[in-house]
């Protein structure tokens, strides 16, 4: 498997600019509400909700916002959201997977298709791009929690398959069926986690023409900015950008 580098298969996230803050909170709130609606409202008893709350805290979402999102799941009325996945190919034929959470699949499909078309890419059918990826459990830990030297041994002892250290965080990879067992083992040492999620990791990363890097980044960021989009994955490698 290719290394899960910063740009290869990264789940492109927003948050670099303050103006993105409200969008991040909106997406996190939606995920918290849906997770609470589908399961127990106690994060300790609901793995999906626990992961959503964990991500919200890592993004510095106020506690009141988190509690309101959970309470919203109990409302008698409200939109019914569904998870939908779109696959396609962007500039230079990079493979892309877009995960959405929507209350209007026609609107979402139209928006995603338009973004792909404007980039010179195309939206494909289910399975058209995902065969370039594998789903793995991804656990991210702030580097303040543990050193580079200690995290590798801990990851192996906890049942993980891979461990990578980046500038600000450690990333532990495992089989998706084992993610909560691995995390439970990590919790014997680690207190604060950035996120615990199932992600699409590329089997191989694809190098692209340096002249097209900016347009590819713009394409991926435009996908991210759609209100219905939760996660964007690609198999592109953009070097040091």
Where are these regions (language model features)?
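N-terminal cationic and glycine-rich segments that engage phosphates or anionic surfaces
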Residues: 1-124, 129-138, 178
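Positively charged, low-complexity, intrinsically disordered RNA-binding extensions
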Residues: 138-241
């Amino acid at each position: 498997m290719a290394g899960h580098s910063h740009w290869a298969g990264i789940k492109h996230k927003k948050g670099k600019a303050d103006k993105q803050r409200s969008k991040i909170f909106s997406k996190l709130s939606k995920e918290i509400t849906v997770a609470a609606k589908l399961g127990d409202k106690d994060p300790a008893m609901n793995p999906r909700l626990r992961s959503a709350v964990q991500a919200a805290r890592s993004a510095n979402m106020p506690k009141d916002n988190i509690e309101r999102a959970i309470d919203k799941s109990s409302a008698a009325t409200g939109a019914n959201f569904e998870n939908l996945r779109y696959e396609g190919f962007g500039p230079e034929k990079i493979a892309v997977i877009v995960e959405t959470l929507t209350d209007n699949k026609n609107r979402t499909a139209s928006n995603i298709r338009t973004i792909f078309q404007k980039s010179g890419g195309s939206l494909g059918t289910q399975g058209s791009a995902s065969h370039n990826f594998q789903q793995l459990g991804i656990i991210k830990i702030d580097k303040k929690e543990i050193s580079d030297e200690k995290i590798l041994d801990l990851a192996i002892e906890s049942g993980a398959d891979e461990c990578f250290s980046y500038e600000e965080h450690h990333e532990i990879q495992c089989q998706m069926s084992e993610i909560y067992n691995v995390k439970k083992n990590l919790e014997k040492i680690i207190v604060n986690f950035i996120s615990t999620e199932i992600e699409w990791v590329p089997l191989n990363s694809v190098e692209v023409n340096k002249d097209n890097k900016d347009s590819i980044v713009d394409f991926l960021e435009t996908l991210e900015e759609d209100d219905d989009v939760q996660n964007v994955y690609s198999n592109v490698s953009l070097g040091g950008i």
